[in-house]
Amino acid sequence: MLTPHKIINLQNHFLIAMPALQDPLFKQSVVYICEHNDAGAMGIVINKLVTRCTVETILNNLKIVSPTRDPSVRLDNPVFAGGPLLDDRGFILHTPIKGFGSSVNISSKAMITTSKDILETLGTPNQPKDVLVALGYSGWDKGQLEHELMENTWLTAPANETILFHTPIIDRWRAAAKILGIDIYNIADQTGHA
């Protein structure tokens, strides 16, 4: 049985919002947990977008132009609203590649980078294979996420790179729940405790 004092490690897992969660920031959201320990948790929402913002918009605003830019690489990919904290800072989820100034391995298939040097590789032969650019992150203080799990706010599922990087954005909530064999649309809006 999960108690508020028992810490489970959800790094490299998805948090899947239960249908009853009506907070507009997290309604029908999927959060990829990048870090989880006894001090709290940090993750990136992977299915909410920043309105009218693309990777190219960010590169142009930061005046990042690479001489090795490959015009065949599309930069019109959307930018994700990673969460309400530090929503003016970039958090880039990507397949692991070494050499960036501020990166943390999350798993063997995902890494997060917050340094500007990764932006300079986007659209070049040096960019990581898969990239998800987000502004902001979601965070939980010590015990807060565990409390929300006990309140049935979230489902949890092991993350996979297909949903993280390739599943159409509109389908990610449902696809993440399907990892558990659940059709999220068949779950009641109200939950209770026995």
Curated annotation (Swiss-Prot):
Superkingdom as given in the UniProt entry: Bacteria
Pfam families assigned to the protein according to its UniProt record, in alphabetical order: DUF179
Entry GO terms, CC: cytosol
Cross-referenced HAMAP family: UPF0301 (MF_00758)
Similarity comment text for this entry: Belongs to the UPF0301 (AlgH) family.
Name this polypeptide is given: UPF0301 protein BPEN_258
